[in-house]
């Protein structure tokens, strides 16, 4: 930029002059620029374009060279008809220059240059320049990494025609430069935030609803479980639909479906219990497609070097959705009544869907606004394959890594669902906390999981970036996700103070969140084309573990103690660790 200021036909106050004296304008005379030559300096000066004085840009070309050169003012000698060069001595040492251009009207002017490609001969190169609106320009240059020595230019040294060095392209706003792949990731994050907000609001609203309609505890349990009827139904179907029709269509359908079911829940409850059960099952149908569809779309948009942290961010949306739902539901119910929580949370889905339709695409090849550079980075030299038309079930179920996913997901969710479902009861019966304290402490594991899921994601991607194999990274992260909870649940039966018990529970859930960079990321590793189906298969096993584990815990507590509950979970965590480390892989096994 500093070189551009020196070569410009405008008059400048030299940045090297302590007085900041303004040079008077040059008289109009027949001058021209020398034709382009093949030396380095000419290549810099002949490929640039004119821009307005108010623009600011920085020339980074100078940062790549240590130059020792002479600046020249070419003129035409009419008697000999050849170009003569007057040189300005400058010694440049390696530093960076930041230039800030300002202008104000005054009685001086600048001359419009002529492009070299318009000149047909040296005779036509000598032209009378056009006089433009008078301006005076000052260049304030701050040298930071380049040391420049030399005497300031005199008025006669400034060429009447010059070519400005620098990139004149306007810089796009930051929101246009934000990577499109992370726009998709953030939209998936907010969809999962809404998913758990709409799911947990019933756990709070069920209390005033049961009082109003006179429901028994058995009826309350039936209502709570009806959600899983639809949720189990669409796990595998959601994966098939996503792999065949694209993640954008399926995830958008899911959010709209469960949002409508959420808004209609108060009406169904007032009509009758059967209608409420059907509406809760419908809501489960919508939420059941969310995870397979998300997994499908991110398998196409996120490169392997960013896979762990992107999935960790999306799944942390579920945890933060639970925190948000548990925090705001009591406030809405106390001020506006229990129906308000369903209306408020359900209506947010329409806002998300509008953004989703405008910004998201099922794959990079379908996005017309995606830059070529980002597309190359996402694909990593490979090409996107056509959508799946048929599912090779026999091939999928014959792969040991697929069964490692299914078994590990079952073992993982058994312990996770037990802790999240029975935690308030444990706080109340064992630690003797009241219900209010128990409710507040229930938020702590969700916050811990949200934080540590993202920490684990960054650690996993860092290891991949440093050359650790994907297989080893997945095994390391999932081993932490299994053995961490096993350790802290074992310690939980030994502690005697409530504070230590709460700390053990929080640490158990925090280490559990490392699974987002383990088995939850592995579906895209072993079969990116079938990522939706693979997640549907393993998550079906995970949901079944939650259903059976929750029921089995109640049976164990009737016959035994909490120590027995934790021991069963610890055993399954160890089994999952062994299966995962023996049979899992980070390599692609399904084409």
Curated annotation (Swiss-Prot):
PROSITE patterns: MFS. Residues 1-38 are annotated as: Disordered. It is found in: Plastid, Chloroplast membrane. Residues 1-76 form a transit peptide. InterPro entries: MFS, MFS_dom, MFS_Na/Anion_cotransporter, MFS_trans_sf, SLC17A9-like. GO terms for biological process: monoatomic ion transport; xanthophyll cycle. Keywords: Chloroplast, Ion transport, Membrane, Plastid, Transit peptide, Transmembrane, Transmembrane helix, Transport. The keyword Nucleotide-binding does not apply. One of its GO terms (molecular function) is phosphate transmembrane transporter activity. Its main location: plastid. The chain crosses the membrane at residues 184-204, 220-240, 249-269, 271-291, 313-333, 336-356, 402-422, 440-460, 475-495, 531-551, 565-585. The keyword Chloroplast applies. It comes from the Eukaryota. One of its GO terms (cellular component) is chloroplast inner membrane. Pfam families: MFS_1. Residues 8-36 have a biased composition (Polar residues). It is a multi-pass membrane protein. CDD domains: MFS_SLC17A9_like. Belongs to the major facilitator superfamily. Sodium/anion cotransporter (TC 2.A.1.14) family. Probable anion transporter. This is Probable anion transporter 4, chloroplastic. It comes from Oryza sativa subsp. japonica.
């Amino acid at each position: 930029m500093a070189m551009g200021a020196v070569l410009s036909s405008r008059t400048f106050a030299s940045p090297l002059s302590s007085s900041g004296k303004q040079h008077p304008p040059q008289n109009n005379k027949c001058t021209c620029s020398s034709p382009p030559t093949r030396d380095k300096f000419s290549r810099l000066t002949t490929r640039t374009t004119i821009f307005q004085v108010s623009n600011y840009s920085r020339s980074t070309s100078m940062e790549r060279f240590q130059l020792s050169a002479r600046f020249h003012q070419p003129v035409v000698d009419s008697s000999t008809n050849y170009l003569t060069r007057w040189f300005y001595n400058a010694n440049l040492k390696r530093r960076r220059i930041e230039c800030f251009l300002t202008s104000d009207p005054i009685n001086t002017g600048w001359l419009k240059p002529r492009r070299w490609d318009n000149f047909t001969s040296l005779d036509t190169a000598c032209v009378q320049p056009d006089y433009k609106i008078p301006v005076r320009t000052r260049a304030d240059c701050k040298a930071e990494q380049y040391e420049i020595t030399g005497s300031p230019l005199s008025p006669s040294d400034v060429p009447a025609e010059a070519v400005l060095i620098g990139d004149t392209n306007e810089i796009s706003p930051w929101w246009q430069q934000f990577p499109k792949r992370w726009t998709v990731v953030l939209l998936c994050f907010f969809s999962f935030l809404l998913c758990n907000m709409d799911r947990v609001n019933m756990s709070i609203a069920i209390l005033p609803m049961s009082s109003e309609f006179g429901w028994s505890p058995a009826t309350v349990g039936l209502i709570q479980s009806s959600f899983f009827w639809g949720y189990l139904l669409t796990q595998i179907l959601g994966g098939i639909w996503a792999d065949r029709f694209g993640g954008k269509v399926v995830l958008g359908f899911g959010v709209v479906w469960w949002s409508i079911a959420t808004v209609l829940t108060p009406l169904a409850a007032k009509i009758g219990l059967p209608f409420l059960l059907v509406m809760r099952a419908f809501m489960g149908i919508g939420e059941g497609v969310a995870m397979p569809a998300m997994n499908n779309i991110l398998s196409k948009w996120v490169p392997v070097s960013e896979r762990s942290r992107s999935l960790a961010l999306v799944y942390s949306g579920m945890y933060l959705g639970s925190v948000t739902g548990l925090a705001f539901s009591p406030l809405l119910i106390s001020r506006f009544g229990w129906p308000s929580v369903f209306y408020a949370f359900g209506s947010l889905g329409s806002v998300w869907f509008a953004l989703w339709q405008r910004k998201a695409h099922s794959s990079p090849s379908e996005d017309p606004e995606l830059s070529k550079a980002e597309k190359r980075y996402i694909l990593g030299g490979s090409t996107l394959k056509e959508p799946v038309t048929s599912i090779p079930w026999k091939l999928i179920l014959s792969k040991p890594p697929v069964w490692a996913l299914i078994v590990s997901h079952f073992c993982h969710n058994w312990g996770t669902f037990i802790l999240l479902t029975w935690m308030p009861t444990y706080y109340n019966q064992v630690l003797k906390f009241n219900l209010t304290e128990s409710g507040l402490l229930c938020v702590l594991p969700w916050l811990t999981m949200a934080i540590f899921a993202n920490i684990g994601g960054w650690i996993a991607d860092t290891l991949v970036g440093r050359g650790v194999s994907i297989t080893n990274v997945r095994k390391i992260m999932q081993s932490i996700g299994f053995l961490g909870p096993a350790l802290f649940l074992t310690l939980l039966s030994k502690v005697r103070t409530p504070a230590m018990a709460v700390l053990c529970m929080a640490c158990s859930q925090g280490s559990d969140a490392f699974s987002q960079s383990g088995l939850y990321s592995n579906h895209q590793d072993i079969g990116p084309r079938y990522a939706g189906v693979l997640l549907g298969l393993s998550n079906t096993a995970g949901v079944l573990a939650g259903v059976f584990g929750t029921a089995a815990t109640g049976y164990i507590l009737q016959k035994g103690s909490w120590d027995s509950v934790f021991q069963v979970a610890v055993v399954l965590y160890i089994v999952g660790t062994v299966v995962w480390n023996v049979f899992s892989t980070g390599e692609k096994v399904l084409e």
